[in-house]
């Protein structure tokens, strides 16, 4: 159990630590492609095949389990539900971040106008026609102008940005690529959360299966294979969490939660080993359904949110070297994870 815990923790930690180091951009793209291949192979080769094996077991009754391809059906349902959850969660985060950004821009715009507009005196605009009457500058009108302008009082903004902790580069970027940056950040957060949900459910099943096993001849090779299995899955998940750029506490919690799920499953399996029958109808159905659902989640995430998002991007299409490296790492990750199915 310790080897699985260490392997999972090491795998998920490497990408998180890598974000703190000045690594080559091509290497990072290769690592992302490798992780996508690992997740794709996990869904197809490990989870879907495991679900099919459990739900086609001879111990299950003929009706309804032999009358319909339930593993593939559950995987399809999971993929469609993941699409729906993906859409809803992304929309929630986008609305939340856009609201916070608008509030920040309005507040920032008002302060910039106070500092940089020569017609302002102590935060007020003197109206010559009204004989010196004072009018407060309209915050919303200025903010709207602020959103659609790429340059506005550089000296005043730089002075303000230093005091407010907003860098000039970040501000300029939000104007030029605000929607793209917002969407990209939200997508990475959603992907990391849904991906962990799919991986964790599978890890618990693996742990319980290992915990209820009584044969040392079976456990030893399985333990080694599962250690590599957890390492590769952790590496893939860690890469997605690193891209989400969560707070250090949030990243650590996701990594910790992944690392302990399989050992917890092992502990549960060991505790119920005396009364657990892995060939009972309830156990086979639970294992088959959960594996099939997890397969649908991971296949969707791998193809839609990881492979399509990167391999169909503009950056990939204009750089042949990056294309070659990414495809090689994608096939390598899928191949290595698939090979583990020989033992686990």
From Swiss-Prot:
GO terms for biological process: response to zinc ion; zinc ion transmembrane transport. Keywords: Cell membrane, Ion transport, Membrane, Transmembrane, Transmembrane helix, Transport, Zinc, Zinc transport. Its main location: membrane. InterPro entries: ZIP, Zn/Fe_permease_fun/pln. It comes from the Eukaryota. One of its GO terms (cellular component) is plasma membrane. The chain crosses the membrane at residues 1-21, 31-51, 73-93, 189-209, 222-242, 252-272, 292-312, 324-344. GO terms for molecular function: zinc ion transmembrane transporter activity. Residues 22-30, 94-188, 243-251, 313-323 are cytoplasmic. The keyword Metal-binding does not apply. Residues 52-72, 210-221, 273-291 are extracellular. It is found in: Cell membrane. Induction: In shoots and roots by zinc starvation. Belongs to the ZIP transporter (TC 2.A.5) family. NCBIfam families: zip (TIGR00820). Zinc transporter involved in zinc uptake in roots. Targeted by BZIP19 transcription factor in response to zinc-deficient conditions. This is Zinc transporter 9. It comes from Arabidopsis thaliana. The lineage of its organism: Eukaryota, Viridiplantae, Streptophyta, Embryophyta, Tracheophyta.
């Amino acid at each position: 159990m310790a080897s699985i815990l260490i392997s999972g923790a090491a795998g998920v930690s490497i990408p998180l630590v890598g974000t703190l180091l000045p690594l080559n951009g091509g290497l990072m793209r290769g690592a992302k492609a490798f992780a996508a291949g690992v997740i794709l192979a996990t869904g197809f080769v490990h989870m879907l095949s495991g679900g099919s094996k459990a739900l086609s077991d001879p111990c299950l009754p003929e009706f309804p389990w032999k009358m319909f391809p339930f593993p593939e059906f559950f995987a399809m349902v999971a993929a469609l539900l993941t699409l729906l959850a993906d859409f809803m969660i992304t929309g929630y985060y986008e609305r939340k971040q856009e609201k916070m950004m608008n509030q920040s821009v309005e507040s920032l715009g008002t302060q910039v106008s106070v500092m940089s507009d020569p017609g302002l005196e102590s935060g007020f605009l003197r109206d010559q026609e009204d004989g010196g009457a004072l009018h407060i500058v309209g915050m919303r009108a200025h903010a709207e102008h602020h959103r659609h302008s790429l340059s506005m009082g550089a000296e005043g903004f730089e002075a303000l940005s230093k005091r407010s902790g907003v860098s000039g580069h970040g501000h300029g970027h939000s104007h030029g690529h605000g929607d793209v940056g917002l969407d990209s950040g939200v997508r990475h957060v959603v992907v990391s959360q849904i991906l962990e949900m799919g991986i964790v459910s599978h890890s618990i099943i693996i742990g319980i299966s290992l915990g209820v096993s009584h044969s040392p001849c079976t456990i030893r090779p399985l333990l080694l294979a599962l250690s590599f299995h957890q390492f590769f899955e952790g590496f893939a998940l860690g890469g997605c969490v690193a891209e989400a750029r969560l707070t250090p506490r949030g990243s650590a919690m996701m990594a910790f939660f992944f690392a302990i799920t399989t050992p917890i499953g092992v502990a549960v399996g060991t505790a119920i080993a005396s009364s657990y029958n892995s060939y009972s109808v309830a156990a086979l159905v639970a294992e088959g359904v959960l594996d099939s659902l997890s397969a649908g989640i991971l296949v969707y995430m791998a193809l839609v949110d990881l492979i399509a998002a990167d391999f169909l991007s503009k950056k990939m299409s204009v750089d042949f070297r990056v294309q070659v490296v990414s495809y090689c790492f994608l096939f390598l990750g899928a191949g290595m994870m698939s090979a583990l199915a020989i033992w686990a």
